[in-house]
Amino acid sequence: MPAVSKGDGMRGLAVFISDIRNCKSKEAEIKRINKELANIRSKFKGDKALDGYSKKKYVCKLLFIFLLGHDIDFGHMEAVNLLSSNKYTEKQIGYLFISVLVNSNSELIRLINNAIKNDLASRNPTFMCLALHCIANVGSREMGEAFAADIPRILVAGDSMDSVKQSAALCLLRLYKASPDLVPMGEWTARVVHLLNDQHMGVVTAAVSLITCLCKKNPDDFKTCISLAVSRLSRIVSSASTDLQDYTYYFVPAPWLSVKLLRLLQCYPPPEDAAVKGRLVECLETVLNKAQEPPKSKKVQHSNAKNAILFETISLIIHYDSEPNLLVRACNQLGQFLQHRETNLRYLALESMCTLASSEFSHEAVKTHIDTVINALKTERDVSVRQRAADLLYAMCDRSNAKQIVSEMLRYLETADYAIREEIVLKVAILAEKYAVDYSWYVDTILNLIRIAGDYVSEEVWYRVLQIVTNRDDVQGYAAKTVFEALQAPACHENMVKVGGYILGEFGNLIAGDPRSSPPVQFSLLHSKFHLCSVATRALLLSTYIKFINLFPETKATIQGVLRAGSQLRNADVELQQRAVEYLTLSSVASTDVLATVLEEMPPFPERESSILAKLKRKKGPGAASALDDSRRDTSSNDINGGVEPTPSTVSTPSPSADLLGLRAAPPPAAPPAPVGGNLLVDVFSDGPTAQPSLGPTPEEAFLSELEPPAPESPMALLADPAPAADPGPEDIGPPIPEADELLNKFVCKNSGVLFENQLLQIGVKSEFRQNLGRMYLFYGNKTSVQFQNFLPTVVHPGDLQTQLAVQTKRVAAQVDGGAQVQQVLNIECLRDFLTPPLLSVRFRYGGTAQSLTLKLPVTINKFFQPTEMAAQDFFQRWKQLSLPLQEAQKIFKANHPMDAEVTKAKLLGFGSALLDNVDPNPENFVGAGIIQTKALQVGCLLRLEPNAQAQMYRLTLRTSKEPVSRHLCELLAQQF
């Protein structure tokens, strides 16, 4: 950029600005401005032609007046004339005026475009940069239509100077963000990728920003950028390389470019090329290693640059979710930041660890920092950091630490900021339900929630506790006793009155034998709260009173007196008046038998999915973690509620006040299958079917009933749509895509992630399995801005799979808006052992063109594993029983991934097997046991994995009671190491 000479200074402009600043009042300023406008207008209209300097000076004055907030309605043509000047300073002022004052509807736009085209066509790099800056600053659609085709040509031209290339890249980025349809994809796309190798810092930085934006909507067109980005990143972070060493910022080479390259790589899955992937892993390890080195400078700029690269590296590791070693190292590095003196670092560490907690590989590592996170929740001064600590506790919670985390969050709730109390309440309610084994603890937790933060307990929370208490006989008496005691508090929240009124109305008879909670005492306690409550709560209490008349006839006269009172029969609220009149008449004219029939105890609610999680997601907003982020398999527990909370049903829970009046009774849910324990192992290592006794649910099986298979004559209770979609036959769909097997293998040891992604569609999966039942959620995301038409995903059973696996689907909307996501629920039942997965066919129309693809659904036989613990003696006894040649499958293979004991352990647990300690004489070996649960039979499975670190080899041996199962499990598991 040429320097401005001393003669280019505009004294008249400086004097005018000084006069404006010296004005003592608004009126004086306006007077001075009007005087100057009159002078400028006379100069422009005068007979004497103005030279370039004068035009520039007067245009600058007009621009200054406009920036002061005054309208300018003349001088535009003079500014346009400056664009034709060959002097840089005059052309610069002309472009500045145009960028600020001229809108796209101006009559001068054609003249402006011609001037810009002339400058772009010139070979003067300074003029070209001014024109490109103007296009980017205006950024209108009209500008895009005029120049979108020219700018890519300038960008990739071999004779363009570096400054022009940089400006062209940023200008094209601005136009693409404003009007993506105007930027044509063509031959230049392949050439722009090679700008990543440019030696000019400005060019490569601008190119990375442009490519990152372009590849989000056209990933296939820019796929070659992966290897180039990895190569450039490797050269920057490697101490042996001299690439961009001149651009070192406080001892950190090219930090902004490094961050942008890492962000670009997050637009794609892990590299398929082994060499590229290895080089990238080496880069990531180098960044993590440098984070452990002592700082080279004490200045904050050094640590900021270093940490910016580190956090972006961790984001890339989390995005890939395929390198267990890196995930654990990232978690350990973030753990060091949890106690850093810098608040921002603590915040970022907590935020990143929330995402790490959802990975099966790093969840256990995150849990080791629970004490530090709890301390942050108690002691942090910044509310946003405390909120992130609460988020992390929620994310790291599983069966092993649920009571501790819920207790700490309840304690924090007493002093929590009002802005986040509702969110904390929802999280506590979800965790209490999700990990409840002892339901008395669940009841205590919810009542504590109401006591501590009653104003923030939404209807979804207390509706849910009523539903669970109604459905479980073993907790009804305890719930009645607990709410009775809670209602005795002098200050009792209205939500507590609602819960107490409902539960005592239904189950008050269970505690009526105690003189301290006799029927008159119960009624007196409830009625003492009546006049302090809202209309809705009083309506519920009136329903409780009529229930009392049925449960406790001795209270009839007292309650009728309350109903007969003028304050009820002539109540200004129609709802209360009607209830009082109808209940009084019902209790007076109906016989005891009729009254008992009308007011009988509520039947169990049909099993439905909790709506509390949906409330939390709405509270967090669309920018919260993706539906896939929370899903993980809880390897510390053998219960399905260790997984993700299901997405709520569209059918809402009935109002408790309506329930007291008696809704249509729904049949109680079928009893779940009997639990499988270690003592059943002796019976399952045979080919014969095993009967499952029909027992009532135990607390440990609380959530298994949600996955109970339907009765033969009825659809699955969990599905809102009772009519499953008709699946096309295998002959109606195309073959699976070439990478279907590779995508399937990613899910053998995990239950959540992205199943498929291209430039149009993303398909995510999260699933949970228990015994022979499973539920899978498929998320279809439209990545384009155009609506998908005739969207039809179907599940197909090839061959004999129909008799081996039952999959029932819920229909999805036929239209998927641009940028939207739809969910499909699949309920799965394993009937017999199977070897091939079902197929997922997705068909839709995009822009008038039919699209279709076929994938393999990630449902493999190991998903129905039940981990089984046993002693060494029992293991070897079973091992010998399964000694027939057809019962054993063995494979010796070379390691495809780094041999790490912790990673191997995590994969075996993710596979579904229990790991047995002190069984194999060689402590380096892994021994596991489990039972494959099917409806027809159970197949016992024993495995032994022998790693040889020196030879980088494994030997895997599996023994089951069925030869095909042994071979299939061996093949599935061997591909994971």
UniProtKB/Swiss-Prot annotation:
Membrane topology label: Peripheral membrane protein
Functional summary from the UniProt entry: Component of the adaptor protein complex 2 (AP-2). Adaptor protein complexes function in protein transport via transport vesicles in different membrane traffic pathways. Adaptor protein complexes are vesicle coat components and appear to be involved in cargo selection and vesicle formation. AP-2 is involved in clathrin-dependent endocytosis in which cargo proteins are incorporated into vesicles surrounded by clathrin (clathrin-coated vesicles, CCVs) which are destined for fusion with the early endosome.
Matches recorded under SUPFAM superfamilies: ARM repeat, Clathrin adaptor appendage domain, Subdomain of clathrin and coatomer appendage domain
Source organism (scientific name): Mus musculus
Distribution of this protein across tissues and organs: Expressed in the brain (at protein level). Isoform A: Expressed only in neuronal tissue and skeletal muscle. Isoform B: Widely expressed.
Quaternary organization: Adaptor protein complex 2 (AP-2) is a heterotetramer composed of two large adaptins (alpha-type subunit AP2A1 or AP2A2 and beta-type subunit AP2B1), a medium adaptin (mu-type subunit AP2M1) and a small adaptin (sigma-type subunit AP2S1). Interacts with HIP1 and RAB11FIP2. Interacts with SLC12A5. Interacts with clathrin. Interacts with SGIP1. Interacts with RFTN1. Interacts with KIAA1107. Interacts with PICALM. Together with AP2B1 and AP2M1, it interacts with ADAM10; this interaction facilitates ADAM10 endocytosis from the plasma membrane during long-term potentiation in hippocampal neurons.
Stored InterPro entries: Adaptor_Complx_Large_Subunit, AP2_complex_asu, ARM-like, ARM-type_fold, Clathrin/coatomer_adapt-like_N, Clathrin_a-adaptin_app_sub_C, Clathrin_a/b/g-adaptin_app_Ig, Clathrin_app_Ig-like_sf
Amino acid composition bias (Low complexity), ranges on this chain: 646-657
SMART domains cross-referenced by the UniProt entry: Alpha_adaptinC2
Keywords: Cell membrane, Coated pit, Endocytosis, Membrane, Phosphoprotein, Protein transport, Transport
Protein name in UniProt: AP-2 complex subunit alpha-1
Any one Pfam family match given in the protein's UniProt record, by short name: Adaptin_N
Cellular compartment(s): Cell membrane; Membrane, Coated pit
Main localisation: membrane
Domain of life of the source: Eukaryota
Regions of compositional bias (Pro residues) in chain numbering: 666-675
Residues modified to Phosphothreonine: T653
Chain intervals for the UniProt region annotation (Disordered): 614-702
Record-level Gene Ontology MF annotations: clathrin adaptor activity; low-density lipoprotein particle receptor binding; protein kinase binding; protein-containing complex binding
GO biological process: clathrin-dependent endocytosis; intracellular protein transport; negative regulation of hyaluronan biosynthetic process; positive regulation of neuron projection development; positive regulation of receptor-mediated endocytosis; postsynaptic neurotransmitter receptor internalization; synaptic vesicle endocytosis; vesicle-mediated transport
List of residues that carry Phosphoserine: S626, S652, S655
GO cellular component: AP-2 adaptor complex; apical plasma membrane; basolateral plasma membrane; cytoplasmic side of plasma membrane; filopodium tip; glutamatergic synapse; membrane coat; postsynaptic endocytic zone
Family of the protein in this entry: Belongs to the adaptor complexes large subunit family.
